[in-house]
Curated annotation (Swiss-Prot):
Pathway: Protein modification; lipoprotein biosynthesis (diacylglyceryl transfer). It is found in: Cell membrane. One of its GO terms (molecular function) is phosphatidylglycerol-prolipoprotein diacylglyceryl transferase activity. This is Phosphatidylglycerol--prolipoprotein diacylglyceryl transferase. It comes from Staphylococcus aureus (strain MRSA252). PROSITE patterns: LGT. Belongs to the Lgt family.
Length: 280
């Protein structure tokens, strides 16, 4: 059976004339949509207007996508410097989640400022949705046969008790590979379940920071298995370095805010405005 693929998945879902619609885009859209509905329930419980998230999600998704591409291009600049026409060809692949998080975060904070919303409250509301969307989105990598780990044997994959369609689609160019997409997807969904259940016990802003911490811990270890990492040097993977920084920053902010401000419990506040400094 080794080397025989019975259920190889075509990355293209269907064609509309000359346009190929890929499973990757469909799955990303599904992840965003499900995340929106999850966040919408939390939004209503918090006493915010039901349309509050529309602009936040639109601009965060738009600028997050752009930033994810820019981030990838920066760390692959030698290639794109010689092939500048490839920069806009996003359908050839090449986006980075950390870049998307940075762009989406900046856009979200700006929208909160314009709409007079509390960014800590909004961050807590959307954090579980973000990690859920990430967990779903990793299946887009599976459909594209990308973002996999290093070589393994078929026997190793069978020992994980994986469905055959996953094992067979991890056979790429004559070799089986670690299904790192699955490892991260499971980690992210577990994070979603945890965050949804502990959010009401956390102080304002902490759900978002714990999301960054949880995601970064998983990403750090899973990244070490991947073969397509963006590299800062020959030994330093960009995603692992960024993950360490996010863990340290997030934990530090949780501790600092508890000592300095002692914020209220997330579950004990209604709709909050943009935070202002009190003048004594």
């Amino acid at each position: 059976m080794g080397g025989i693929v019975f259920n190889y998945i075509d990355p293209v879902a269907f064609n509309l004339g000359p346009l190929s619609v890929r499973w990757y885009g469909i799955i990303i859209a599904v992840g965003i949509l499900l995340g929106y509905f999850v966040a919408q329930r939390a939004l209503v419980k918090a006493g915010l207007h039901k349309d509050t998230l529309v602009d936040i999600i639109f601009y965060s998704a738009l600028f997050g996508f752009i930033a994810a591409r820019i981030y990838f291009v920066i760390f692959q600049w030698p290639y794109y410097a010689e092939n500048p026409g490839e920069i806009i060809k996003i359908w050839h692949g090449g986006i980075a989640i950390h870049g998307g998080l940075i762009g989406g975060f900046i856009a979200g904070v700006i929208v909160c400022k314009v709409k007079n919303l509390n960014p800590f409250q909004i961050g807590d509301i959307v954090a579980p949705s973000i990690i859920l969307a990430q967990g779903i989105g990793r299946w887009g990598n599976f459909m594209n046969h990308e973002a996999h780990g290093g070589p393994v044997s078929r026997a190793f994959l069978e020992q994980l008790h994986l469905p055959n369609f996953i094992i067979e689609n991890m056979y790429i160019n004559g070799q089986y590979y670690h299904p790192t997409f699955l490892y991260e997807s499971i980690w992210d969904v577990a994070g979603f379940i945890i965050l949804v259940n502990i959010r009401k016990h956390l102080k304002l802003g902490e759900t978002f920071f714990l999301y960054l911490t949880w995601y970064s811990i998983g990403r750090f270890f899973i990244e070490g298995l991947r073969t397509d990492s963006l590299m800062l040097t020959s030994n330093i993977r960009v995603a692992q370095l960024v993950s360490i920084l996010l863990i340290l920053i997030s934990i530090s902010l949780i501790v600092y805010r508890r000592i300095k401000y002692n914020p209220p419990l997330y579950s004990k506040v209604g709709a909050l405005p943009w935070p202002t400094r009190k003048v004594k």
